[in-house]
A protein has these predicted regions:
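PLP-dependent class I/II
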Residues: 2-4, 12-14, 19-22, 26-33, ...
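Substrate/cofactor-recognition hotspot
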Residues: 8
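Flexible nucleotide-interacting loop at or near the entrance of a catalytic core
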Residues: 61
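Conserved N-terminal alpha-helix of the aminotransferase class I/II PLP-enzyme fold
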Residues: 64-97
Length: 399
């Protein structure tokens, strides 16, 4: 009898974390590696937020809090939703967890029964399907190819819905593609979901504040007829460069929020009291950092997309948000690297690129779509220039 649970055997370690760890190991061994696999901003947390955390420590704010978040943080979250999304919530419709991933995991654990289906559009964030599996559910993968801009086709969505469908996960701006759903896109999806009142919607809005060129963010809870079926997840990690602080939150139906709190009460209990104090300042304080950072990301995106599209065999769409691009490497399949290894899959491409050129990216198949790779441009322009030169040279070396 194995000590490892059957449910754990269904899942795999996070590929994005694995790539980042591999890059670290190579660097530690003295190799020159540029890591473009990590999904975290390279900017420091703003000083006003750090000072709020220091004040909380000095004030002795170091005890347990309410399981699913302090009253003051929940109030700040309520105000955020009203101010930025024109959504009205009460504090008993808010939950706070140790990061957005934690909130989504809790939601799946709190709501899924064996055999319940969750529609996961691909390309997807790597953890969605495995969290569904851990909770006993069945992920239903809905492929969204580059011809669709990596976005859901409403007719294909409708074909994926069954009586067993409990959730659909929406992620805009998207990890890994940077694709963003316009208000019109969301309303088309809502038109389909309106026919199926048993389907709930988990909207992962963690990249809300990373959009470009005047893109107007719209979230599906803003459609009144669907709001009672929507759990809207967000957090401070990406917007305020607070990935290590581990604060995510969600707003939604009281029944689901209460169930999530029950799960959390028997697992992590409350998120860090210090991190919660910092998150209050992030949400209530100056928002100038967001605008400044978005400008930097847009410059990087423009450079990366242009450089990639100048490489024979690679094609890259121009994303409207997040800090990723998701280029195709299909034009390089069948070629051989300098060691004679034939590139048959995107995983072959990614491994050969790392081994031969010291650039770490993540294969598209890890996100549910073969023939692509993900680059995170959340690093310095200097690193990006070096990395793109290396990628270009590597591709030219293939024959």
């Amino acid at each position: 009898m194995s000590i490892i649970s059957d449910s754990l055997k269904k899942i795999k370690p996070s590929p994005t974390i694995a790539v980042t760890q591999k890059a670290r190991e190579l660097k530690a061994a003295g190799k020159d590696v540029i890591g473009l696999g990590a999904g975290e901003p390279d900017f420091d947390t703003p000083d006003n937020i750090k000072q709020a955390a220091i004040k909380a420590i000095n004030d002795g704010d170091t005890k347990y809090t309410a399981v699913d978040g302090t009253a003051v943080l929940k109030d700040a979250i309520v105000k955020k939703f009203k101010r930025e999304n024109n959504l009205d919530y009460t504090t008993d419709q808010i939950t706070v967890g140790a990061g957005g991933k934690h909130v989504i995991y809790n939601a799946m654990m709190a709501t899924l029964n064996e055999g319940d289906e969750v529609i996961v559009p691909a390309p997807y964030w790597v953890s969605y399907p495995d969290m569904v599996l851990l909770a006993g559910g069945t992920p239903i993968i809905l492929e969204c190819n580059e011809k669709q801009g990596f976005k859901i086709n409403p007719a294909e969505l409708e074909k994926s819905i069954t009586q067993k469908t409990k959730w659909i996960i929406l992620n805009s701006p998207s990890n890994p593609t940077g694709a963003c759903y316009t208000e019109g896109d969301i309303k088309e999806i809502a038109g389909v979901l309106a026919k199926y009142p048993h389907v709930h919607i988990l909207s992962d809005d963690i990249y809300e504040h990373v959009t470009y060129e005047g893109f107007k963010f719209f979230t599906i809870a803003q459609i009144d007829s669907l709001k009672e079926r929507v759990l809207t997840m967000n957090g401070v990690s990406k917007a305020y460069s607070m990935t290590g602080w581990r604060i995510g939150y969600a707003a939604g139906p009281k029944e689901i929020i209460k169930a999530i709190a029950k799960i959390q009460s028997q697992s992590t209990t409350n998120p860090s009291s210090i991190s919660q104090a910092a998150a209050v300042e992030a949400l209530n304080g100056t928002q100038d950092f967001i605008k400044e950072r978005a400008t930097s990301f847009q410059e990087r995106r423009n450079f990366v997309v242009k450089a990639l599209n100048e490489i024979d065999g690679i094609e890259c769409l121009n994303p409207d948000g997040a800090f990723y691009v998701f280029p195709s490497c299909k034009g390089l399949m069948g070629k051989k690297d300098t060691s004679g290894k034939e590139l048959k899959t995107d995983t072959d491409f990614v491994q050969s690129l790392l081994e031969n050129s010291g650039v770490a990216v993540v294969q598209g198949s890890a996100f549910g779509l073969e023939g692509f790779f993900r680059i995170s441009y959340a690093t310095s322009m200097e690193n990006l220039k070096k990395a793109l030169e290396k990628i270009s040279s590597f591709c030219k070396s293939l024959n």
